[in-house]
Amino acid sequence: MSERHKDISNSSKRIATNTLVLFARMLVLTFVNLYTVRLVLAGLGTEDYGIFNAIAGVVTASTCISSVLALSTQRFYSYSIGKRETERLQEIFSVSLNICLLLSVCFILLFEIVGPWLVSTLLTIPQSRMEAAQLLLQFSLFSFIFTLLQIPFIGAIFAHENMGYYALVSTFDCIVKLLIAYGLGRTGNDNLVYYGAALMIESLVVMIIYMTIARRKYAECQYAIVREKVLYKELFSFSGWSFYGALAGVGMTQGSSVIL
């Protein structure tokens, strides 16, 4: 009985600690993001800021899509951790990574084919900013991809309830974006191109940090070939309706930006 009480006590402490950590993270991110938006608007100007919002909306979309997929991955991780199925954990990680890689290829093909046409014909962009807008599209696309590829690693961190790592990395992410915004107008380069390229590099760095933490902390975060089709179907079906709902919400928000 004492062991049971000890486990309950440890679990309660962990929940309380994670709650406080995530609350502190939310406060920091809220204030930093508010100031970052102010710097970006001042640095880009109204015209370039509008172009950025219309084209780089794919980055906003990636946040929504990745959260849905991360939730699905975390659910399968947590279930297997509870049952102490070590081999199953590695299979879930590998399948999740395969799905993210497949989605990445699909998005690259889609936006490389449709994206340039969309920017040049459907969006109202001054001809003098067209080249910068096309470059921004490429940078935004790969920022999206790097965010997508973080999912299996973030899912493992969530499932193991190590919210401190997540809070630290996401705070680092937010502060670096603030520094990037502060650099607008100070580099001597085209501000729109600089901002898109810097955000892409920052997304790559954050992805590498998550990968490094997960691979060092969790034995299951090692890739293995998985041919079990049932697991692929389960992951897809669990995230399906949430994914459609998130995609609809993003489409409504970003669709308004494009129309305006």
For each feature predicted by the language model, list its residue ranges.
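Transmembrane-helix boundary and interhelical linker motifs in polytopic inner-membrane proteins
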Residues: 4-13, 45-46, 62-100, 119-124, ...
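Interhelical loop/hinge segments that connect adjacent transmembrane helices in multipass membrane
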Residues: 1-15, 192-198, 210-253
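Alpha-helical transmembrane segments of multi-pass membrane transporters/permeases
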Residues: 16-28, 137, 142, 156-182, ...
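Membrane-interface helix-loop junctions in multi-pass transport and translocation proteins
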Residues: 41-43, 47-48, 161-164, 175-208, ...
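Alpha-helical transmembrane segments of multi-pass membrane proteins
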Residues: 125-150, 167, 171, 179, ...
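Short membrane-interface helical motifs at transmembrane helix boundaries
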Residues: 42, 108-127
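Residue-level recognition of pore/gate-forming positions within transmembrane alpha-helices
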Residues: 26, 30, 57-60, 95, ...
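Signature of the first transmembrane helix
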Residues: 13-78, 108-112, 177-178, 240-260
